[in-house]
């Protein structure tokens, strides 16, 4: 599994939410209050941190924190 703590810290930094709110089930828009600009910035930060590329199509499918870790795991396997 992708380093959940690393993903979590990026989300906390990018969205300005409390660490306790960032769970695998947390939905970026509904639970963490992200808007479209937030999600673009989050994708860019994740790409930089993990050395990956996330297409716009894939980014649209990523709805929760758990989706991020699964996506990164699939790319790295």
From Swiss-Prot:
<dbReference type="InterPro" id="IPR006162">
    <property type="entry name" value="Ppantetheine_attach_site"/>
</dbReference>
<dbReference type="GO" id="GO:0000036">
    <property type="term" value="F:acyl carrier activity"/>
</dbReference>
<dbReference type="InterPro" id="IPR003231">
    <property type="entry name" value="ACP"/>
</dbReference>
<protein>
    <recommendedName>
        <fullName>Acyl carrier protein</fullName>
    </recommendedName>
</protein>
<comment type="similarity">
    <text>Belongs to the acyl carrier protein (ACP) family.</text>
</comment>
<feature type="domain" description="Carrier">
    <location>
        <begin position="1"/>
        <end position="76"/>
    </location>
</feature>
<dbReference type="GO" id="GO:0005829">
    <property type="term" value="C:cytosol"/>
</dbReference>
<dbReference type="GO" id="GO:0000035">
    <property type="term" value="F:acyl binding"/>
</dbReference>
<keyword id="KW-0444">Lipid biosynthesis</keyword>
<keyword id="KW-0275">Fatty acid biosynthesis</keyword>
<keyword id="KW-0276">Fatty acid metabolism</keyword>
<feature type="modified residue" description="O-(pantetheine 4'-phosphoryl)serine">
    <location>
        <position position="36"/>
    </location>
</feature>
<dbReference type="Pfam" id="PF00550">
    <property type="entry name" value="PP-binding"/>
</dbReference>
<dbReference type="GO" id="GO:0016020">
    <property type="term" value="C:membrane"/>
</dbReference>
<comment type="function">
    <text>Carrier of the growing fatty acid chain in fatty acid biosynthesis.</text>
</comment>
<keyword id="KW-0597">Phosphoprotein</keyword>
<dbReference type="InterPro" id="IPR009081">
    <property type="entry name" value="PP-bd_ACP"/>
</dbReference>
<keyword id="KW-0596">Phosphopantetheine</keyword>
<keyword id="KW-0443">Lipid metabolism</keyword>
<comment type="pathway">
    <text>Lipid metabolism; fatty acid biosynthesis.</text>
</comment>
<keyword id="KW-0963">Cytoplasm</keyword>
<dbReference type="GO" id="GO:0009245">
    <property type="term" value="P:lipid A biosynthetic process"/>
</dbReference>
<dbReference type="InterPro" id="IPR036736">
    <property type="entry name" value="ACP-like_sf"/>
</dbReference>
């Amino acid at each position: 599994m992708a380093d959940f703590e690393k993903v979590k810290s990026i989300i906390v930094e990018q969205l300005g939410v409390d660490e306790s709110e960032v769970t695998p089930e947390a939905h970026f828009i509904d639970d963490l209050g992200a808007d479209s600009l937030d999600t673009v910035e989050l994708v860019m930060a994740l790409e930089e941190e993990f050395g990956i590329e996330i297409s716009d199509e894939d980014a649209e499918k990523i709805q929760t924190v758990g989706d991020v870790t699964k996506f990164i795991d699939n790319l790295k396997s």
